[in-house]
Every structure is written in structure tokens, then in C-alpha cells.
From Swiss-Prot:
Chief site of localization: membrane
Organism: Xenopus laevis (African clawed frog)
Task of the protein: One gap junction consists of a cluster of closely packed pairs of transmembrane channels, the connexons, through which materials of low MW diffuse from one cell to a neighboring cell.
Name recorded for this polypeptide: Gap junction beta-1 protein
Keyword Membrane listed: yes
One of the record's GO molecular function terms: gap junction channel activity
Source species taxonomy: Eukaryota, Metazoa, Chordata, Craniata, Vertebrata
UniProt key word Transferase: no
Transmembrane segments annotated in the record for this chain: 23-45, 76-98, 131-153, 192-214
Topological category with respect to the lipid bilayer: Multi-pass membrane protein
InterPro entries: Connexin (IPR000500), Connexin32 (IPR002267), Connexin_CCC (IPR019570), Connexin_CS (IPR017990), Connexin_N (IPR013092), Connexin_N_sf (IPR038359)
GO BP: any one term: cell-cell signaling
Keyword field: Cell junction, Cell membrane, Gap junction, Membrane, Transmembrane, Transmembrane helix
Family that this chain belongs to: Belongs to the connexin family. Beta-type (group I) subfamily.
Amino acid sequence: MNWAGLYAILSGVNRHSTSIGRIWLSVVFIFRIMVLVAAAESVWGDEKSAFTCNTQQPGCNSVCYDHFFPISHIRLWALQLIIVSTPALLVAMHVAHLQHQEKKELRLSRHVKDQELAEVKKHKVKISGTLWWTYISSVFFRIIFEAAFMYIFYLIYPGYSMIRLLKCDAYPCPNTVDCFVSRPTEKTIFTVFMLVASGVCIVLNVAEVFFLIAQACTRRARRHRDSGSISKEHQQNEMNLLITGGSIIKRSAGQEKGDHCSTS
């Protein structure tokens, strides 16, 4: 699996993410993808070949392995990382659309150089307006996917621990046989580590949702305050104009009266 390609895509989104979003990407890449590639795959590399049962019945080992491990831990984690990272593509596509619109407006407004158009792609897009809704929706989807996979993992492997001895009576085993898992303690440690990393990602995503909401409320309050101050300033200017205009009228009336008296 090309994890470098996935990281390149996520890094493109990372430029337009919040500070919490950047921490989330670091946790995903360093503590999950790197561990999955560097360590976990070697630990689970012999899971099927080293799974043995105390019987010589052909097919019993394979049937018992499939019964207790319907899907490999490695494949389940890989699928989880891919699906959890997918919502970030929504943000990437939205940012690309906004940058395309900005380039289009620049071309229509004036003659621009290719270098200026290339610079548009490097600009950080502010998370506001429709992009805010896209971004917060992607974070919500990440939370849902993480929680769903943790629940699926619990349904498939109750207790999240690797059992050393398994009792299997599935056909074609002649009777209840004992099956043994290789390196159960090491696999349990990696399982707990990956689940803790998944829990940390959920906490970071929830924190990012609250951060985005607080940021939006702050911008709204600032706009309301600025519009209120502008409105008060406008009213004060109108009042000053009225006062100034009234004093001018009074002076004009007094001057006309003085001229009339002098003429008389």
C-alpha cells in the first residue's frame, strides 16, 4: 500500500487546517501509519502460518483461523486509516474549487502573469463561509468513522486482547481442538496501542469541532461589534452635520437681520 501517496494528499490539506488539525495529522502519520508499516506488519506477518491446532485433520487449521480471525488486524487498521482520511479529500476539493474561482476572477479582472496564478495555489485559504461547513462536516465524519471502527473491532475481537488458547469445534475438525496463537502478548500490546491512538484522534477531532465553533462565534461577535460601532459613528456624523448645519443657518439668519437693520 502506498502510504506516502496518502500522506502527500493529507499534507496538501494540512496547509489549510487548524492547529489541532495539524496535530491530528501528526498522530495519524507518526503513531498510526508508521507503526502499522514499520512494526505491526512484521508482528502479524506470520499470523496464519503460525496459527496451529492439535490435530492433523486437513482444513481444520484454516477453518478455525477464519472462525476466530474473520478479518486480519492489519487489514482492518489499513481500511480504517483510509476511510478516516477520506473526508479530508472533501476539504482538498473545496479548496481547489475556491482557488480555481480566484484564478478565474483574476483573469477576468485584469491581465495577469502565470507566476501570479501559480502563487494563488500557495495561498492559505481562510476557513470561513462554505469552506467552514465543509471542514466541520469532514471532522464530524472522521469522528463517526473512528467510533464505528472501534465498535466493529470490539464486535469482532471482544475485550481487545489476544487469547493464547482457543477452543475450536468447527467442521471439519473431528472434535473440540486446542488452537494456539503466536506472540499473543506482543499482538495485544500493539492492539491496545492502535486503539489508544484512535481514541486520541477522536479527542482531537472533538476538540477541533469546539475550536471551529468558538472561532465562528468570535468572528460573528466581532462583525456585530464592528457593525455596531460603524452604525454609531454614522449616527454621530449625521448629528454633527445637523448641528453644524443648524449653526450655519442661525449665523446666516443673524447676518441677514443685521444687514436689514443697517439698510434701514
